[in-house]
Amino acid sequence: MQVQATAKWVRVPPRKARLVAEVVQGMPVTEALSVLSFMTQAAAGDVGKVVRSAAANAENNFNLDRDRLQLLRVDVDGGPIIKRFRPRARGSSYSIFKRTCHLRAVVEDNLDRPTRQRARAPRPAVAASDPAASVDDEEE
């Protein structure tokens, strides 16, 4: 079962939030929160807040065990841009764009997903002869 939580109009640029979100995608929730707590980026606090909220939604609304939750994905979408102007010389001005983003964390109970066994391709047969001997034959 997938459970989600959203945070809108977060005052972090989407580009910086995506850098943090890519690190924790696919991790177990407890491990992701531990990693986020040690990250120095400002967006780590906001991403952690959304992940904690999604885990709390799963725990309280759907009676799922917090230790079995897997962070499926963290979506970062661009929000509205706050525009400000900085006065410059001779009556001109520079634009300042304060970007915002919308965050959505999706967690799921990792026992719901069936575990797949990857079929391994057969390895090519290794030649019985010594590779060094074949190099000597080619030089002659």
Regions found by a protein language model. Give the residues of each.
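Structured, basic alpha/beta domains of bacterial-type, RNA-associated proteins
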Residues: 1-136, 140
